[in-house]
Regions:
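Glycine-rich hexapeptide-repeat left-handed beta-helix
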Residues: 26-27, 31-181
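Right-handed parallel beta-helix
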Residues: 1-37, 44
Length: 181
């Protein structure tokens, strides 16, 4: 089947590639180099491929924005909730591997890598270059610091602020997130 359902007010840039049997709800924006696999669902008013805020200070202390040249790759059988933003990679792509589920109102920043079958629950923020292994579970309203990795089958408790790597199978909770005893 090659049926892909597009609803009103969807914007798709010319570089975007959408696979077969996808559902793209109203108000979705697909920007720049975005590749979407087969059997994906993208809910209302989600933005994929937007620039993130990557900055540095110059020698005079002025903020300088660093351009981003990557894209976003979304593999097969991924579901993305409403009002979610997935930023494009700085150089390489942000990648959402097959089977992932991202809830409503999440922010997935540049260069994030979500392992297969990972669940990210509502209002979670994953900052630049953070990652998960396969089958990780990030509970709602959690924050993952830039560059931090969450291991395979690891669990992040609700409202946690993850500032250090979480090992495979680890369970963390709190602010800052600590290993559950």
């Amino acid at each position: 089947s090659v049926i892909t359902a597009l609803f009103p007010d969807v914007y798709i840039d010319s570089e975007v590639v959408v696979g077969n049997n996808c559902y793209i709800a109203s108000g979705v924006k697909l920007l720049g180099s975005v590749k979407i696999g087969n059997d994906c669902i993208i809910r209302e008013n989600t933005v994929i491929g937007s620039d993130g805020l990557t900055t540095r200070r110059d020698e005079n202390g002025k903020v300088v924005t660093i351009p981003q040249f990557g894209g976003v790759t979304i593999e097969d059988n991924v579901q993305i909730g409403a009002l979610t933003v997935i930023g494009k990679g700085a150089i390489d792509d942000t990648v959402i591997h097959s089977g992932c589920r991202i809830d409503n109102c999440c922010f997935i920043s540049h260069n994030v890598q979500l392992g297969e079958d990972t669940l990210v629950v509502g209002e979670t923020i994953m900052f630049g270059s953070s990652s998960t292994g396969k089958q990780a579970f990030i509970s709602g309203n959690s924050t993952v610091r830039d560059g931090v990795s969450i291991g395979e089958k690891a669990l992040v408790g609700m409202g946690s602020v993850v500032v250090k790597p979480v090992p495979d199978g680890g369970i963390v909770k709190g602010n800052p997130a600590k290993q559950k005893e």
